[in-house]
Design a protein with these regions (language model features):
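Short glycine- and acidic-rich boundary segments immediately preceding or forming the N-terminal edge
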Residues: 9-47, 417-419
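Metallocarboxypeptidase
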Residues: 36, 46-48, 67, 109, ...
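Short proline/glycine- and polar residue-rich coil/turn motifs
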Residues: 42, 501-509
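Active-site/substrate-binding loop(s) of hydrolase catalytic cores
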Residues: 60-63, 75-79, 83-294
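Short amphipathic, basic-aromatic surface patches that mediate peripheral association
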Residues: 459-474
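Short solvent-exposed strand-capping/beta-turn motif centered on an Asx-Ser/Thr pair
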Residues: 460-464, 520-522, 533
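Short, hydrophobic beta-strand segments
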Residues: 513-521
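Terminal connector regions
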Residues: 522-552
Length: 552
């Protein structure tokens, strides 16, 4: 979590969605054994999966998916995805002393870098503007026309910025700390200005920007505690081609055990934990009592993920800093509750903290959160702010145009995104290491006489994460794990199901499976198979006499 120091003269730049795809295509061409690109269902522009694994060995593996932000006004996550993939493939080459080469044989990493491709490209357009969601024509003012009255470059300076109207009792006041910052007044406080984005009254209804370019916030379009009151909500959830394509891909790939939703600006890692528990209702007929310890195990895993995050990024919490809220219907909650995957939001950067030596003395009226954020952005990115200039507006008369650009205060600089990707890659590496990895660690036999043996197989999870979250196990999300004693004429099954299942195996824990068999020759081999949606296929063969001695 960082902002880099001063940038070099050769500053990095953000790439369009088409350019991002072209760079991934180059990686796939250069490293066909490690990198494959798969179009998501529906063939929506910008929606594809970059799959990194040892593709020469096409076996099922647990997978971690990295999403390049579901907000169209954030550019840095897609660039970070590209930089992370590049670094992983360099490290995965077998002729280098690397760590990722071994992991990509047992874990698959999937990047979906540009879920909101069309919207993010507007930020890079000739007259940049920011749209948070996927583009969708909407009639916001119910005049039977769509998107006809939105932001425009009124003064022709090539930039869309703010427009302020001087009015006694207006909604905004000038900051006493810096005249560049306009602060929304507290209730009962009289301001000096009204503030809007640049625009005209294009449809002659007396309003400005009341029907801008329509969009649906993809980040909150998923059917989990969805709300039509959420800003940018559609009429119903998951009606967009983008949300359907993502959902279809996730459902078709149940091996996805963890997901990272990369975001641009924020604070600490947030881990999806399900619906907050409501206060317990009075005892009564028909009331369901939740099982004891409901969600406790997933909270433990969430705490472990937070620890991994701090250890691998150097993140230091700040006083008064609260976790970011992703709102209703967000993708992380949906992945956790509907798909049974550990899901988290990872923020590449946060606002720079004032240097300790520059801290002002304790104030009676400290700045509001928005005021403090504006003041820090003025220090960090003064080029995103324009001086106010007088202008004669066709509808509003004498106004001033300037202030913040429409695309300001949403993203880190490209060089910062590339540097932040290094920290994100360290966290991704730690997550690969923590992912559930199953191994047959022991086969034991007890001689019951007359060629009969009691057999016990021990299956261990050598990762820190559970095979699936506790919520998935309690909700009966279908992620079966099967252990089979393969049928063989030489080995007769006396008791025990030939194919047995385990609901879950916690990180660092074991599960045991037992059979009673009869062998004509105690040195004949038995064959065992382990199969699951989130594990590599495992096989083990041993004779009853070749097994370890049974220990009670």
């Amino acid at each position: 979590m960082l902002f880099a120091a001063a940038l070099s003269a050769q500053e990095a730049k953000y790439l369009s969605s088409t350019e991002i795809r072209a760079e991934f295509d180059k990686l796939a061409k250069a490293e066909p054994d490690w990198c494959k690109i798969e179009e998501l269902p529906g063939k929506v522009f910008g929606l594809y999966a970059v799959r990194l694994a040892r593709h020469k060995e096409p076996v099922n593996r647990p997978a971690i998916v990295v999403l390049g932000s579901l907000r169209g006004d954030e550019l840095s996550p897609a660039l970070a995805c590209l930089e992370m993939a590049r670094a992983m493939l360099v490290r995965a080459k077998p002729d280098l002393p690397v760590r990722f080469g071994a992991w990509l044989q047992v874990v698959e990493v999937i990047f979906i870098p540009t879920p909101c491709a069309s919207s993010r490209d507007l930020v890079l357009g000739a007259k940049p503007t920011a749209v948070a969601g996927v583009l969708a024509p909407l009639d916001d003012d119910r005049d039977l026309a769509t998107d006809e009255d939105g932001l425009e470059d009124v003064n022709g300076d090539g930039v869309i910025s703010q427009l302020r109207i001087k009015r006694q009792g207006g909604r905004y006041r000038v900051s006493s700390r810096d005249v560049c910052a306009l602060i929304e007044c507290a209730p009962g406080e009289l301001g000096a200005y009204d503030l809007i984005w640049e625009g005209f009254d294009n449809d002659g209804d007396g309003q400005i920007n009341e029907d801008p370019r329509g969009s649906i916030t993809l980040a909150n379009d998923f059917a989990i505690r969805w709300s039509d009151k959420q800003p940018g909500a559609n009429r119903f959830p998951m009606l967009t081609a983008e949300s359907r394509a993502l959902a279809d891909f996730f459902v078709a790939h149940p091996n996805i055990s963890a997901a990272i939703n990369l975001r641009s600006l924020g604070g600490a890692l947030t881990v999806a934990g399900g619906q907050p528990q409501a206060p317990e209702a009075p005892a009564g007929r028909g009331r369901r009592t939740p099982p004891q310890g409901d969600g406790a195990r997933d909270k433990q895993v969430g705490d472990a993920l937070q620890k991994l995050f701090v250890e691998n990024t150097g993140y230091k919490p700040r006083q008064g800093e609260e976790p970011e809220s992703e709102g209703a219907g967000n993708v992380a909650d949906w992945l956790y509750e509907a798909c049974g995957a550990y899901a988290m939001n990872y923020y590449l950067a946060r606002l720079p903290e004032p240097e300790k030596g520059d801290k002002p003395p304790r104030e009676e009226n400290p700045p509001t959160k928005d005021e403090a954020a504006q003041l820090e952005w003025l220090k960090h990115a003064p080029e995103d702010y324009l001086e106010w200039k007088s202008f004669k507006h066709a509808t509003l008369g004498d106004v001033e145009i300037g202030g913040w650009k429409a695309v300001a205060r949403r993203d880190v600089k490209p060089a910062h995104a590339i540097e932040a990707a290094t920290k994100a890659l360290d966290f991704l590496w730690a997550l690969c290491d923590a992912t559930a990895r199953l191994r047959i660690t022991k086969l034991e036999a007890k001689d019951l006489g007359d060629g009969t043996f009691k057999i016990r197989l021990t299956l261990s999870n050598e990762g820190a994460l559970d095979y699936k979250p506790q919520h998935a196990a309690q909700s009966r999300i279908g992620l079966p794990l099967w252990v089979t004693l393969v049928e063989d004429k030489k080995i007769e099954l006396v008791s025990g199901a030939r194919r047995q299942s385990a609901e879950n195996i916690n990180g660092g824990a074991t599960a045991t499976f037992e059979w009673v068999v009869r062998a004509k020759d105690p040195f004949d081999f038995m064959k065992f198979k382990v199969e699951g949606e989130r594990c590599m296929p495992l096989e083990e063969s041993k004779s009853p006499k070749g097994c370890e001695e049974w220990k009670e």
